[in-house]
Swiss-Prot record:
The gene is cusB. PANTHER family: CATION EFFLUX SYSTEM PROTEIN CUSB. The cus efflux system is composed of CusA, CusB, CusC and CusF. One of its GO terms (biological process) is response to toxic substance. Residues 1-28 form the signal peptide. Keywords: Copper, Copper transport, Ion transport, Signal, Transport. Part of a cation efflux system that mediates resistance to copper and silver. Belongs to the membrane fusion protein (MFP) (TC 8.A.1) family. It comes from the Bacteria. One of its GO terms (molecular function) is transmembrane transporter activity. This is Cation efflux system protein CusB.
Length: 407
């Protein structure tokens, strides 16, 4: 019994010594990690892809196959930006770009169409009533040269006036009387060449030929021999072919970039080898309400008549603006209600800022205001940072500051 009691006593003594030793070692152990955990109070957990949904405990995201991320109390700050773990930004491929100042270049092609030049347009009319003796073999679409005969007419009023003129000449009429009759013929529409012929030959002309007043293409001509024709009836319509018009619809938002003809390059698929010369251009004043475009009209040389009305063409606009603030277009966050970027300050914090966009072209966006030359903006990996800014309240602070400046 004594032996058993001795063994039990030894075991109790050993347990007491072990417990005391464990307590001493536990007290001597550095409390760094415990202290660190205690200092970093967790407010909630969240999925970076759905930052507005918060969870009260860790685990897997119900939206994505990824662990929830803790939001620590010491990350809440009154500063305007947010700080993100560098490992996270590196893994997500966050990249930055510098705000620069320079011209915004613009190069875009627009479909265009060849049409008649409305300034090269002539209407041939009968200046007095008569009847048609002869119609020359012409029809719509035929090309004519200036002075080409269109039809022969007999006009009784002109014949009568010529008879009066010759009678006065024979009976000794005064110069005033004869000149009055000639002026009456001019007002009645008798061609000046026929009047000169009357004076020179002293013979009555009974048949008169109407001729093409310009080079061009007949677009209206529907008369036959033997038809009566009334005063001011349209005999023919002729459209000139040199120069022609080429028109294209361009967005109203880039109209301010159009300055001179050197910015345009014009090509026609039907004649890809042809070099086209633009005489002049004009932006028509009206804006199409449906497409928000303006009509750009070019006057193009067409001496060889290679360009035909109705042909398709391509107009390429190459231009550049005055120097302005530029950022990569992928750095812009456009929600529809506001436009913002994420900048990087001197301390490495990500700060959201509102910007006013002027124009975008070829992956570059020009700004009216909001940034300064030399600032850094995030151009890749925006989603994580913008989500973090939303969670931390940085976006609300940005909007509050913008509202304060506005007032």
């Amino acid at each position: 019994m004594k032996k058993i009691a001795l063994i039990i006593g030894s075991m109790i003594a050993g347990g007491i010594i072990s417990a005391a030793g464990f307590t001493w070692f536990a007290k001597a152990e550095p409390p760094a990690e415990k202290t660190s955990t205690a200092e970093r109070k967790i407010l909630f957990w969240y999925d970076p892809m759905y930052p507005n949904t918060r969870f009260d405990k860790p685990g897997k995201s119900p939206f994505m196959d990824m662990d929830l991320v803790p939001k620590y109390a010491d990350e809440e700050s009154s500063a305007s930006g947010v700080r993100i773990d560098p490992t996270q930004t590196q893994n997500l491929g966050v990249k930055t770009a510098t705000v620069t100042r320079g011209p915004l270049t613009f190069a875009q092609s627009f479909p265009a169409n060849v049409s008649y030049n409305e300034y090269q347009y002539a209407i041939v009319q009968a200046r007095a009533a008569g009847f048609i003796d002869k119609v020359y073999p012409l029809t719509v679409g035929d090309k004519v040269q200036k002075g080409a005969p269109l039809l022969d007419l007999t006009i009784p009023d002109w014949v009568e006036a010529q008879s009066e003129y010759l009678l006065l000449r024979e009976t000794g009429g005064t110069a005033t009387q004869t000149e009055g009759i000639l002026e009456r013929l001019r007002l009645a529409g008798m061609p000046e060449a026929d009047i000169r012929r009357l004076i020179a030959t002293q013979k009555i002309q009974t048949r008169f030929t109407l001729k093409a007043p310009i080079d061009g293409v007949i677009t209206a001509f529907d008369l036959r021999a033997g038809m009566n024709i009334a005063k001011d009836n349209v005999v023919a319509k002729i459209q000139g072919m040199d120069p022609v018009w080429v028109t294209a619809a361009i967005p109203e938002s880039i109209a301010w970039l159009v300055k001179d003809a050197s910015q345009f390059t014009l090509t026609v698929p039907a004649r890809p080898d042809k070099t086209l010369t633009i005489r002049k251009w004009t932006l028509l004043p009206g804006v199409d309400a449906a497409t928000r475009t303006l009509q750009l009209r070019l006057e193009v040389d067409n001496a060889d008549e290679a360009l035909k009305p109705g042909m398709n063409a391509w107009l390429k606009l190459n231009t550049a603006s005055e120097p302005m603030l530029l950022i990569p277009s992928q750095a812009l966050i456009d929600t529809g209600s506001e436009q913002r970027v994420i900048t990087v300050d001197a301390d490495g914090r990500f700060v959201p800022k509102r910007v006013a966009v002027f124009q975008a072209s070829q992956g570059v966006t020009a700004l009216r205001s909001g940034l300064a030359e030399g600032e850094k903006v995030v151009s890749s990996g925006l989603f994580l940072i913008d989500s973090e800014a939303n969670i931390s309240g940085a976006l609300e602070r940005m909007r509050s500051e913008s509202a304060t400046h506005a007032h």
